[in-house]
UniProtKB/Swiss-Prot annotation:
Keyword Protease: no
Lineage: Bacteria, Bacillati, Bacillota, Bacilli, Bacillales
Keywords: Cytoplasm, Endonuclease, Hydrolase, Magnesium, Metal-binding, Nuclease
Matching SUPFAM superfamilies: Ribonuclease H-like (SSF53098)
Gene name tied to this protein: rnhC
The protein's name: Ribonuclease HIII
Record text on cofactor binding: Manganese or magnesium. Binds 1 divalent metal ion per monomer in the absence of substrate. May bind a second metal ion after substrate binding.
Organism (species): Staphylococcus haemolyticus (strain JCSC1435)
Length: 310
C-alpha cells in the first residue's frame, strides 16, 4: 500500500477540506480530519501533515494537491546498519520497547509495533527517531500520527499492579519480559504473519532470561532478534519506543493534574524532594499509588520528611 505525506500550510489545509467531504468528529488524538476517497484514505493531522494511503494514493494526491511534490522520497543508504546488525528497515518487522522503567513516578508502558518495509519511508518522512532524542511535545505529535496507521499493541502496568508484582518477587526484568511478549503476540494477531520477517526487541535481557521470564513462548522464535540500542537500528523499535513513551508522558500529565503539582520524570534528587512533599501533604500511601515502591527515592523522601520535623 502506497503512503505519501505532504506538509501543508493552514490555508492549504482549508482549501483541501473544501474540495471533498471529510469527517472531523470522533477522530484519533492528533488528527484534524479524515476521509476515504477513490479507494484511498486521507488523514490530516494537527501538525499540518497530510497522509495519503492506498493503491491510488499517488493519483489522488496529484488530483487534490497538483502544486505539491511528495516529501516521502526514498532515503539513501541510511537504511543500512553497520557491523553484523541486520538492515531491519529493509524488512517487515515487529519492534518492541518500553518506557518508565527508570522513572520513580509513573507506570511501566510497553509497546510492540509493526512496520512494513513499505512504511519505512513514511516513518522517516514523519521524523520517527529514537524517543530519547525527542522532547515530550514531539513525542506526542509523532505518536498521535503513528497510532492511526501502524498496527500496534500498547500495554500499561500501573503503579499498584507494578508494586504488587514486585512485592511477590517479580523483578523489573520479569515484568518487562511478560509485557513485551504479550504485546508482540497481540500484534501478530493484527497482521499477516506470512509477511513478517523479524521480531526485534530492544534488549533488556539475554534471550535465555527473556524466555524464562516471559511466561509464554516467543511467538516466532526463529524470527526473533534482540538488539541493544535498538531504536537506532530498527524503525519498528523506534515507533514502539515513541508510542510507549507517549503513553508514559500522558500518564505523568494525569498524575501531575491529580496531585496539582508538576511531577518530574527520572529518579533524581528533585524527585526525592517532590516525593517528600507528597508524603508531607498526602501521606506515604498516596505516594505509593503513583510510584514504584522499591526505588531508593522512597526511602530518601522519607528521610527528608523526618529531618524536617526533627
Amino acid at each position: 500500500m502506497a503512503n505519501i505525506v505532504y506538509k501543508l500550510s493552514e490555508s492549504e489545509i482549508q482549501h483541501l477540506l473544501q474540495q471533498i467531504t471529510f469527517e472531523t468528529s470522533q477522530l484519533s488524538p492528533g488528527m484534524k480530519a479524515r476521509t476515504k476517497y477513490k479507494q484511498s484514505v486521507i488523514n490530516i493531522y494537527n501538525s499540518g501533515k497530510v497522509m495519503f494511503q492506498g493503491k491510488n494514493a499517488e493519483a489522488v494526491a496529484q488530483q487534490l494537491l497538483p502544486d505539491h511534490t511528495t516529501t516521502s522520497k526514498n532515503s539513501s543508504s541510511s537504511n543500512q546498519s553497520s557491523g553484523e546488525t541486520l538492515a531491519y528497515n529493509h524488512y517487515n518487522c515487529i519492534g518492541s520497547d518500553e518506557a518508565g522503567s527508570g522513572d520513580y513516578f509513573g507506570p511501566l508502558t510497553v509497546c510492540a509495533a509493526y512496520v512494513s518495509k513499505e512504511n519505512v519511508k513514511i516513518l522517516k518522512t514523519l521524523g520517527v527517531d529514537d524517543s530519547k532524542k525527542l522532547n515530550d511535545q514531539k513525542i506526542i505529535e509523532l505518536a498521535e500520527q503513528l497510532i492511526t496507521f501502524i498496527p500496534h499493541s500498547l500495554l500499561t502496568l500501573d503503579n499498584p499492579k507494578y508494586n504488587d508484582r514486585q512485592a511477590i518477587g517479580w523483578s523489573q526484568v520479569k515484568m518487562k519480559a511478560e509485557l513485551h511478549n504479550e504485546a508482540i503476540k497481540n500484534v501478530t494477531q493484527k497482521i499477516n504473519c506470512n509477511e513478517l520477517n523479524y521480531i526485534v526487541i530492544d534488549q533488556f535481557a539475554v534471550r535465555g532470561v527473556y524466555q524464562r521470564y516471559a511466561l509464554s513462548s516467543l511467538p516466532y522464535p526463529e524470527k526473533t532478534k534482540f538488539e541493544t540500542k535498538g531504536e537506532s537500528k530498527s524503525l519498528a523499535i523506534a515507533a514502539a519506543s515513541i508510542i510507549s513513551r507517549y503513553a508514559f508522558v500522558k500518564h505523568m500529565d494525569h498524575i501531575s493534574h491529580k496531585m496539582k503539582q508538576d511531577i518530574p520524570k527520572g529518579a533524581s534528587n528533585k524527585v526525592d524532594l517532590i516525593a517528600a512533599q507528597i508524603i508531607d501533604k498526602h501521606g506515604i500511601e498516596t505516594l505509593d499509588l503513583i510510584s514504584k515502591k522499591h526505588f531508593k527515592n522512597r526511602e530518601k523522601a522519607q528521610n527528608l520528611v523526618t529531618k524536617k520535623y526533627k
